[in-house]
A protein has these predicted regions:
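A generic secondary-structure signal
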Residues: 10-13, 48-52, 101-106, 124-128
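Short beta-strand elements of ligand-binding domains
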Residues: 64, 87-88, 134-138
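A short N-terminal helical cap/helix-turn-helix that marks the beginning
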Residues: 1-22, 40-42
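Short acidic/polar active-site loop segments enriched in Thr and Asp
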Residues: 55, 83, 109
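Short hydrophobic alpha-helices that are characteristic scaffold elements of the AMP-binding
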Residues: 50, 74-86, 105
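Conserved AMP-binding/adenylate-forming core of the ANL superfamily
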Residues: 21-75, 91-100
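Conserved ATP-dependent adenylate/AMP-binding module captured primarily in the ANL superfamily
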Residues: 89-125
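Conserved helix-loop-beta element of the AMP-binding
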Residues: 107, 127-138
Length: 138
């Protein structure tokens, strides 16, 4: 049995395997992602994170709608030694308020989100006097 210290090593070691993650979205929509493709995608997402300024030990809020986006961002963070803070995007103002409470507690935050969630966060911030708080992410 292999033992891996960093979790990212486990994914890297399984690139040649036939194992995969199955994403099921709805009754007739299923997609299989082999570990080799997952590693390549995560490495690409990590490069994007790094190009945007994320560094090891930074805190990355992952707030995305789709499971596939979450898995890619999660493994990118693992590969980059980034502290992951998963937050459900949700559909209510309470979800957005929770995001801002979490953001206030972080020291070096980054945000991985989708366009729709970003728009909802920006609208909520503007309506609730929190626009300045979003500057912490710049």
């Amino acid at each position: 049995m292999n033992t891996f210290k960093p979790l990212g090593e486990a994914l890297a070691a399984r690139q040649a395997s036939q194992h995969a993650i199955n994403f099921i979205e709805g009754d007739n929509n299923e997609r299989r992602q082999p570990f080799s493709g997952l590693f390549a995608r995560a490495a690409g997402v990590l490069k994007h994170f790094q190009d945007c300024g994320a560094a090891p030990h930074d805190e990355m809020i992952i707030m995305v709608e789709r499971n596939e986006q979450f898995i890619d961002a999660f493994w990118a963070g693992v590969l980059g030694n980034i502290v992951l803070v998963p937050v459900a995007p949700g559909s209510t103002d309470e979800h957005r308020a929770k995001f801002f409470r979490i953001l206030a507690k972080l020291q070096r935050p980054c945000l991985c989100t989708d366009a729709a969630t970003s728009a909802r966060l920006n609208n909520y911030a503007a309506a609730n006097g929190l626009a300045e708080d979003l500057k912490k992410l710049e």
